[in-house]
């Protein structure tokens, strides 16, 4: 019998998750179906309940419902509790298990696919929203030399630094405080690239040894990556690899099989080109 999975969001028509999971299933010999589920704001619980009642086995959650999924789950992993957000729900034995695979997806893309160790590196993350909250704990697990969050509203960055202090030291600053400082890894976790804009970074943050990573994926260079390229950053990467890696972790949670990701990432980049 084919097991049913889906991704739920609003909007959802743009999601590449069905393509990714169908390729994972084909490669690992798993019998699943995977679809997109649209939910009106305020109807997340109703739509999920209907999905479970129809025999659904698991859900991926995208914007704007990761907080709803966190509250919906009856059992949470440590990384989901740290993020206070869930992107993977599993329905088993009458319970709802919540996990967050965003951070491990980012770390695997950087460390394994890009072959750029995080341990001992100076890491800068731009933004202080949900995207940052979802990845801080796995990054801190890698033991960077330092981890700095920069945000227009410093108090939001400070709140995150305080929340994650039990996992490691996190510095919170405004963008102006980055003047005269450089970093080994700079991660853009703001939504500026979606609006064809750029965070207000001072010059000098990037060096020829810097990995510039935009969590948004694009067919061309985002404004953030264009800026990094113009300042001679050593390596540029968008978030497509993270998307595939977080999906692979979800797939492994559901199916007990760890799919190979590089081929799927390359296929997806061709599809999006």
Swiss-Prot record:
One of its GO terms (molecular function) is NADP binding. This is Shikimate dehydrogenase (NADP(+)). Involved in the biosynthesis of the chorismate, which leads to the biosynthesis of aromatic amino acids. Catalyzes the reversible NADPH linked reduction of 3-dehydroshikimate (DHSA) to yield shikimate (SA). Pfam families: SDH_C, Shikimate_DH, Shikimate_dh_N. InterPro entries: Aminoacid_DH-like_N_sf, NAD(P)-bd_dom_sf, SDH_C, Shikimate_DH, Shikimate_DH-bd_N, Shikimate_DH_fam, Shikm_DH/Glu-tRNA_Rdtase. Keywords: Amino-acid biosynthesis, Aromatic amino acid biosynthesis, NADP, Oxidoreductase. The keyword Oxidoreductase applies. One of its GO terms (cellular component) is cytosol. It catalyses: shikimate + NADP(+) = 3-dehydroshikimate + NADPH + H(+). It comes from Chromobacterium violaceum (strain ATCC 12472 / DSM 30191 / JCM 1249 / CCUG 213 / NBRC 12614 / NCIMB 9131 / NCTC 9757 / MK). GO terms for biological process: amino acid biosynthetic process; aromatic amino acid family biosynthetic process; chorismate biosynthetic process; shikimate metabolic process. Gene3D superfamilies: Leucine Dehydrogenase, chain A, domain 1, NAD(P)-binding Rossmann-like Domain. Belongs to the shikimate dehydrogenase family. Shikimate binds at residues 15-17, 62, 87, 102, 217. It comes from the Bacteria. NADP(+) binds at residues 78, 127-131, 151-156, 215, 239. CDD domains: NAD_bind_Shikimate_DH. Homodimer. Pathway: Metabolic intermediate biosynthesis; chorismate biosynthesis; chorismate from D-erythrose 4-phosphate and phosphoenolpyruvate: step 4/7.
């Amino acid at each position: 019998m084919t097991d049913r999975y889906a991704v739920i969001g609003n909007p959802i028509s743009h999601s590449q998750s069905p393509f990714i999971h169908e390729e994972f299933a084909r490669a690992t010999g798993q019998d699943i179906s995977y679809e997109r589920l649209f939910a009106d704001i305020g109807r997340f619980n109703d739509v999920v309940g209907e999905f479970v009642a129809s025999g659904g086995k698991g859900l991926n959650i995208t914007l704007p419902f990761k907080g709803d999924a966190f509250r919906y789950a009856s059992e949470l992993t440590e990384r989901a509790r740290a993020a206070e957000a869930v992107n993977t729900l599993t329905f088993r034995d009458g319970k709802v298990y919540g996990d967050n695979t965003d951070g491990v997806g980012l770390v695997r893309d950087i460390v394994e696919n890009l072959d750029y160790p995080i341990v001992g590196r100076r890491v800068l993350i731009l933004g202080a929203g949900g995207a940052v909250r979802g990845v801080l704990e796995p990054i801190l697990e890698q033991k960077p030399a330092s981890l700095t969050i920069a945000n227009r509203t410093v108090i939001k960055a400070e709140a995150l630094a305080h929340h994650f202090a039990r996992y490691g030291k996190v510095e919170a600053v405004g963008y102006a405080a980055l003047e005269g400082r450089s970093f080994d890894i700079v991660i853009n976790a703001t939504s500026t690239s979606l609006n064809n804009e750029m965070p207000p970074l001072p010059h000098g943050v990037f060096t020829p040894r810097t990995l510039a990573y935009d969590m948004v994926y694009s067919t061309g260079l985002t404004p953030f990556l264009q800026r990094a390229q113009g300042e001679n950053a050593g390596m540029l990467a968008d978030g497509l690899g993270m998307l595939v890696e977080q999906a692979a972790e979800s797939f492994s949670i559901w199916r007990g099989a760890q799919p190979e990701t590089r081929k799927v990432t390359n296929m997806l980049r061709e599809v999006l080109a």
